[in-house]
C-alpha cells in the first residue's frame, strides 16, 4: 500500500508518525514551497514512521522562504497550492507533480527500505527555465 500526503501540513505527518500500522506501507509526503519554486519530498517504507529528520532537513529552506516572502502576510487565505491565490503558477505545480510521480515510482520499483528525503529547486539561467535540480538528498536506514 502507498499513502501519498500532499497537504504540506505538519499535523498530518504527525498523525502518520503516531500511527502504528499493522502492515508495511510506503508513505510519500510531497509539498511545494511558497511560489512553488522548491519541491520537498520524503519517502518511507515500513509500519512506523518518523518525520523529524525531514523536518530538520527542510526547516532552513522554509525559514529562507519566509524572508523572501516578507511582503506576504503569513499565514494567509488560500495557503494551499490548490488555491487560486497561492503565489505560484499552475505550470510550477505541474512540474512539481510530475517530478513527484517519477520519484515515487522509482522508489517503489527500487523496493528501497531506506528513508529518502529530497529537496528540488527550479533552476533558471538568464531568466530561462532549465530544470528541477536536487539540492539536498538524504537517505537513512
Q: Residue locations for each model-derived region?
A:
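Glycine-rich phosphate/adenylate-binding loop
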Residues: 6-141
Amino acid at each position: 500500500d502507498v499513502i501519498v500526503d500532499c497537504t504540506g501540513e505538519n499535523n498530518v505527518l504527525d498523525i502518520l508518525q503516531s500511527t502504528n500500522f499493522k502492515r508495511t506501507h510506503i508513505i510519500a509526503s510531497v509539498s511545494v514551497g511558497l511560489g512553488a519554486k522548491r519541491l520537498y519530498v520524503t519517502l518511507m517504507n515500513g509500519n512506523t514512521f518518523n518525520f523529524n529528520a525531514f523536518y530538520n532537513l527542510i526547516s532552513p529552506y522554509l525559514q529562507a522562504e519566509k524572508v523572501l516572502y516578507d511582503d506576504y502576510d503569513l499565514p494567509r487565505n488560500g495557503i494551499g497550492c490548490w488555491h487560486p491565490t497561492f503565489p505560484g503558477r499552475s505550470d510550477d505545480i505541474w512540474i512539481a507533480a510530475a517530478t513527484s510521480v517519477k520519484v515515487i515510482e522509482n522508489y517503489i520499483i527500487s523496493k528501497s527500505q531506506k528513508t529518502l528525503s529530497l529537496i528540488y529547486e527550479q533552476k533558471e539561467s538568464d531568466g530561462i527555465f532549465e530544470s528541477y535540480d536536487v539540492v539536498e538528498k538524504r537517505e537513512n536506514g
